[in-house]
Structures are given as structure tokens and as C-alpha cells.
């Protein structure tokens, strides 16, 4: 079964009211997404979605005629294009979806996984006051969620600490993860990053509160700073959601000594790369646990990878209602991915990633 064509479709989904993401200085009034369709010569299709795919024609030229089952070669070709251009990993993910459909197997099983569900942590997106965050966390707990991730974005962490402390005190049933949002910046955002001393002081406060992990308290490339944090504090340190290469992820594990490395399969390394990084993490007694904030398809791809590779008890699920509801997150999908009453989440049953786009339903949002 050979690859015959690669098609892309662009969409823009309006966000009204706007989403006030903690990591973005500008309100988000829409979300753009690209769906890639990889077709084989027998008519089987595979789908994935993420950011724009400006290299579609180049990838199509390099991949047409390739054996779709030779996913390592597909991965290698995407990697060579990624080096020179943008993040093209949704093509590799779509090929895995195609293979799953051809073999009538879910992707997590193709990847060697043996389970179909995993505990979810609800990943918040907005900055809100302590009372509102406690209210939202209590509602999530009552719905079965076992863990939440809280965002902050203040230069002075003391501004945000009362929110974290309130959740730990008033919703003690939840594991709490904290994202400092210092790893990277949005285009044009020149806000200074924390230094190692600031991050260490904050880490000690979170350790006192029993926080599960501290995520991205330093710039992603500050390997010496991460190593000092890892060796100087007792809390798990997580990083690497936006790395470009496997080498960067590997360096965070080895030189940076982070406990959790977080490359997103649709942004860095695809599913083959995730497996390699996860195995390295396991050998070092650490874990790979993916970032999943793109869209519903991105969450789905990372969920399949987590089922196969992750040794973390949780997987990230973007969910912060009413600002970021499951319906808002999954507008691109024909189904909504729900967290069960026992706190677990699964892909939809079926082959490949488990869903195929309903192009008629989302045609109203198409822009290209």
C-alpha cells in the first residue's frame, strides 16, 4: 500500500467570547487548524490536524509512491523537511491513522500499547482568582477528574501562589500540577523569563504545598538551570512541550535532568519520535508525558501515544470550562472526548485514531 496523495484543508473557528489564554498577551478570537488527508493507492485515507502545513507540496513529492507501512522512512523524510521548514509532524500522524484503518487496529495498539484508557488531568487555560479557580476545580472533581494543572504568568510568583494554595486547601482530593509558562513566549512577547533563583524559590513553595510537578519554570534551553533545579529541589520538574527536535528533548532528560519531558507528537517528532524519547526517559527512570494543547485531533494523537508509551499516571486534557469547554476544544472532531466518572479518558473505539472528519459539518469554518 503506497502513498498516493496528500491534501490539506484550512479552517478557522470563531471564539465568542474570546479565550483569554494565560500564555498569550492577546485575547484569542478564533482558532485556526489544518486537516491533512493522506491517501493510499487503494483509496484508504488517514487524517490528522495541527498548525498550517506550508510544505505540503514538498512532502507530497517526497512521499508519493512510498510504502505507507514503512513508517520509519516516512518519519525520516518528515524530519528532513522539518529541519529546513516548519513543524510537519501531522503528516506522519496521518500515515499512522491510515495504517490503523488499513489493519483495522487503533493506533495505540499499533504502537505496542496494551491499555485503552488512562487517567486525565484537566489542564486549565485562564488566569482567574482563587475563589473562581476553586469553584472550577470543585466542579471538575465532582465530575470525576482526579488531577488539575493550574497556570500562572506573573513575573512575581507570589501573585499566583494564593490560587494554588487555595485549591490545595479547599479541593484536597485533587493532585495539582503547576505550569509557570516560562519555557517560551508568543510572537512579540518580550516579557523577561525567570532566572534559576526565582524558579528555585517558587519550587520550594510548591514542594511545601505538595504539588505534583512544576512545569517550565525556566526557558526551555536553560539546561544548566534545569539541572540545578532538579538536583536542588524535591519536586518533579517538567519541560519540553515546544522543543523542535528529539535531540532537544534528549538534552532536557540527560543534561537538564528533568523528571518529565513533554514533546507534543503533532509539533515535535511525531509518533516514532515520541516512542524513542519515551524509551530513553524510561531508561533514565523518568517519564514522557505529552503536551496536548492544539485542537481535538492533537489531543487524540497524543492520547494514543500516551496509551502506548507514557509511564506517567496522567495525560493532559485541555479543559477549563466555561472558558475552554470540551465542545470548544473538539470543534474539529465529530465526537467530543469525555473524561469518565472514574477520571479516565479513551480514544473513540475504532481503527486508526478512532475518528474521521465530518467535512460537511465543519465546511462553514473552511478558509482554504
Regions picked out by a protein language model, each given a short descriptive name:
Residues 5-7, 38-103:
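Metal- or metallocofactor-binding catalytic centers and their adjacent structured scaffolds
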Residues 3, 43, 59, 91, ...:
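Conserved, mostly hydrophobic/aromatic
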Residues 66, 70-73, 219-238, 243-344:
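Shared catalytic-loop signature of beta/alpha-barrel
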Residues 92-127:
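Glycine-rich, aromatic-flanked loop segments that form ligand/cofactor-binding clefts
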Residues 117-233:
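Metal-dependent enolase-superfamily TIM-barrel catalytic cores that perform enediolate-based chemistry
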Residues 50, 122-125, 150-152, 178-182, ...:
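A cross-domain feature marking catalytic cores of carbohydrate-active enzymes
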Amino acid at each position: 500500500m503506497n502513498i498516493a496523495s496528500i491534501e490539506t484543508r484550512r479552517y478557522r473557528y470563531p471564539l465568542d467570547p474570546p479565550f483569554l489564554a494565560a500564555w498569550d498577551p492577546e485575547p484569542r478570537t478564533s482558532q485556526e487548524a489544518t486537516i491533512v488527508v493522506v491517501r493510499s493507492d487503494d483509496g484508504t485515507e488517514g487524517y490528522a490536524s495541527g498548525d498550517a502545513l506550508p510544505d505540503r507540496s514538498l512532502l507530497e513529492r517526497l512521499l508519493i509512491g512510498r510504502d505507507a507501512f514503512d513508517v520509519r522512512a516516512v518519519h525520516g523524510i518528515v524530519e528532513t523537511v522539518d529541519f529546513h521548514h516548519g513543524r510537519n509532524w501531522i503528516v506522519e500522524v496521518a500515515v499512522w491513522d491510515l495504517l490503523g484503518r488499513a489493519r483495522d487496529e487503533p493506533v495505540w495498539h499499533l504502537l505496542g500499547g496494551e491499555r485503552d484508557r488512562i487517567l486525565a488531568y484537566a489542564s486549565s487555560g485562564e488566569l482567574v482568582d482563587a475563589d473562581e479557580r476553586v469553584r472550577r476545580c470543585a466542579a471538575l472533581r465532582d465530575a470525576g477528574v482526579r488531577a488539575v494543572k493550574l497556570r500562572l504568568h506573573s513575573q512575581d510568583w507570589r501573585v499566583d501562589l494564593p490560587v494554588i494554595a487555595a485549591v490545595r486547601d479547599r479541593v484536597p482530593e485533587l493532585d495539582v500540577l503547576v505550569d509557570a509558562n516560562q519555557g517560551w513566549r508568543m510572537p512579540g512577547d518580550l516579557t523577561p523569563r525567570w532566572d534559576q533563583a526565582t524558579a528555585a524559590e517558587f519550587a520550594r513553595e510548591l514542594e511545601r504545598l505538595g504539588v505534583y510537578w512544576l512545569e517550565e519554570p525556566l526557558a526551555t534551553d536553560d539546561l544548566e538551570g534545569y539541572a540545578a533545579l532538579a538536583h536542588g529541589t524535591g519536586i518533579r520538574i517538567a519541560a519540553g512541550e515546544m522543543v523542535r527536535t528529539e535531540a532537544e528533548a534528549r538534552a532536557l532528560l540527560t543534561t537538564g535532568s528533568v523528571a518529565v519531558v513533554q514533546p507534543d507528537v503533532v509539533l515535535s517528532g511525531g509518533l516514532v519520535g515520541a516512542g524513542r524519547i519515551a524509551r530513553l526517559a524510561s531508561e533514565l527512570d523518568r517519564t514522557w508525558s505529552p503536551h496536548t494543547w492544539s485542537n481535538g485531533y492533537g489531543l487524540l494523537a497524543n492520547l494514543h501515544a500516551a496509551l502506548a508509551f507514557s509511564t506517567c499516571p496522567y495525560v493532559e486534557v485541555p479543559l477549563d470550562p466555561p472558558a475552554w469547554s470540551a465542545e470548544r476544544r473538539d470543534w474539529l472532531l465529530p465526537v467530543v472526548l469525555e473524561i469518565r466518572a472514574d477520571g479516565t479518558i479513551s480514544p473513540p473505539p475504532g481503527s486508526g485514531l478512532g475518528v474521521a472528519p465530518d467535512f460537511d459539518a465543519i465546511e462553514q469554518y473552511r478558509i482554504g
